[in-house]
């Protein structure tokens, strides 16, 4: 991703993670998704600061450590479209401190994208690039119910199609090693994302945090994480069936440093990335190796 962003913006680009004090409709109704912790799966240590202060402090650090000169304002925690439009406009605007912010990335649920929000994001497209990150996790409806996602596949498809009509860049989040999924579910997820024409994918590995429903299930022995070998098999299959035009934003998760019951089989992020790359090379395969365009890829010869 870093090389892709460098080519796109002709500069070193760094992502600034923002906690804008939003919440989530699930938490107000039936409770959070089972994997979500009290921070809304966001780990910004600066969440007590204003949005502007979060941006400025992170930017200063990234400029010194990475020599970054351009930045993505990434609204990560909870559902970042779940508020009145006027509130959203104010908080998004606060992140655009100056011209060094080249992209606004908004992470949310597919059932929290009403038309007025898409129209608001249209407004921001005149100032910066805008990407909409939508959590799908899996194409398997039974697994979605176990995860307590509170939406189905149809809502995700609807959100993607409407966002694309507005010319928005769409990034999908998936978890490839869900214990309730099979290999076929992972492959079908890759195919669906490809046919929908999403622009990017963030692939996550399942981790278990203490203060979450999943954490309680883990301690009770209600499920077993899949093995690393199975994770690797699913990751390779997902990549093979994914359109080569889709940008891979990540290959594994970044779990919190404390309060984690299970994460990445005790491996570092780079060990997992290296293992995936090594396995791709060993099998002489690549992203899109088994991808077939919609309609079976048959040319119309009439």
Task: Please identify what each model-predicted range represents.
Residues 1-3, 9-13, 200, 208-302:
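Auxiliary Fe-S-binding modules of radical SAM enzymes
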Residues 1-72:
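N-terminal [4Fe-4S]-dependent radical SAM core
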Residues 14-18, 71-76, 104-106, 130-134, ...:
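Hydrophobic faces of well-ordered beta-strands that scaffold small-molecule active sites
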Residues 22, 77-81, 110-112, 136-140, ...:
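Active-site-proximal loop/turn and secondary-structure-junction residues that shape catalytic pockets
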Residues 33, 94-101, 188-202, 272-286:
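Structural recognition of alpha->loop->beta junctions
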Residues 39-58, 66-85, 100-113, 129-155, ...:
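Core AdoMet radical
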Residues 62-66, 92-99, 119-129, 161-165:
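Acidic (Asp/Glu)-rich catalytic clusters
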Residues 154-213, 229-252:
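Conserved C-terminal portion of the radical SAM core fold
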């Amino acid at each position: 991703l870093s090389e892709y962003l460098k080519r796109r913006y002709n500069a070193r680009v760094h992502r600034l993670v923002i906690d804008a004090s939003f919440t989530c409709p699930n938490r107000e109704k039936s409770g959070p998704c089972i994997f979500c912790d009290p921070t809304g799966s966001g780990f910004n240590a600066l969440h007590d600061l204003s949005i502007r202060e979060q941006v400025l402090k992170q930017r200063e650090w990234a400029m010194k450590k990475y020599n970054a000169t351009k930045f993505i304002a990434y609204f990560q925690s909870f559902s970042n479209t779940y508020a009145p439009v006027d509130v959203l406009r104010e908080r998004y605007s606060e992140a655009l401190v100056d011209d060094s912010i080249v992209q606004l990335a908004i992470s949310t649920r597919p059932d929290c994208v009403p038309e007025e929000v898409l129209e608001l994001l249209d407004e921001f497209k005149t100032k910066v690039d805008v990407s909409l990150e939508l959590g799908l996790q899996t194409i398997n409806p039974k697994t979605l119910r176990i995860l307590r996602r509170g939406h189905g596949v149809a809502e995700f498809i609807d959100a993607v199609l409407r966002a694309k009509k507005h010319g928005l860049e769409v990034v999908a989040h998936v978890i490839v090693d869900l214990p309730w999924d099979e290999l076929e579910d992972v492959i079908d997820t890759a195919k669906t994302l490809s046919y929908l024409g999403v622009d990017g994918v963030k692939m996550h590995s399942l981790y278990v945090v203490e203060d979450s429903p999943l954490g309680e299930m883990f301690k009770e022995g209600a499920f077993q994480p899949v093995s690393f070998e199975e994770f690797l098999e699913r990751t390779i299959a997902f990549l093979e069936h994914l359109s080569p035009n889709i940008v891979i934003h990540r290959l594994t998760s970044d779990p919190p440093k404390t309060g984690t019951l299970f994460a990445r089989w005790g491996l570092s992020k780079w060990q997992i990335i290296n293992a995936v790359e090594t396995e791709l090379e060993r099998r002489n395969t690549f992203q899109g190796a088994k991808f077939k365009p919609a309609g079976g890829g048959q040319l119309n010869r009439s």
